[in-house]
Amino acid sequence: EYMQAMGFPSKVIDSHKLMAHINDRVKKKFKTDAKLVRRFLYPYIYLNEELIEEKDIDLEDVEEVVAKAAMKFPGIAYAATASAIKEGELPANQAMYARILNNYHPQRSGHVHLVAEQYNMLVHWEWNGKPGMHGTVWSYDSFVPVFFAGPGINKSRVVRRVGPHDVAPTIAAYLGIKPP
């Protein structure tokens, strides 16, 4: 609501409607009523590997159908399959590529990583109206202000990107001790 009030084209994407859209496409493509899509847990869609294997359907084909269906849904900017992530076949947008890759874990991540369009929020139904989320690929969602204040700390501004790995060395330097 805040982004809309500020004039940004934003909306909340309902995961129930998105998943209904995807399931419809999967059922039509593979001519089955079997539940090949197991669940959505932001930002991933998980597939039912056992059932896909039982039905003798290629897992990568299902990933592709799911990704293409997701990208046709209003508010979804990109969908990366686990196969594409493993092969390094990701979007040319280097910041997006790095964030998708850094979020991926072969044993825990889902089969399709969804990216909502900028200023849109892909809401998982279990969130029950919680106001925020983590893990988007857009830079404005990754800005976290870092402040250091205390005796002997002069006013300063750092304009380069900083991360958690910068905090400990900064504090160590202030304390005059060896950084971890």
Task: Spell out what each predicted region is.
Residues 148-166, 170:
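His/Asp/Glu-rich mid-to-C-terminal helical/loop segments that flank catalytic regions of hydrolases
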Residues 1, 176-180:
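Short, intrinsically disordered, charge-balanced linker/junction segments flanking boundaries
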Residues 1, 114, 146-147, 167-172:
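Beta-strand elements within well-structured catalytic alpha/beta cores of enzymes
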Residues 1-125:
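Secreted, luminal/periplasmic, and some membrane-associated catalytic domains
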Residues 120, 124-156:
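Low-complexity, glycine/alanine/valine/leucine- and proline-rich hydrophobic stretches
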Residues 50-57, 132-134, 153-161:
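Second-shell loop/turn segments in exported
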Residues 39, 105-108, 137-141, 163-165:
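A structural signal for short secondary-structure junctions
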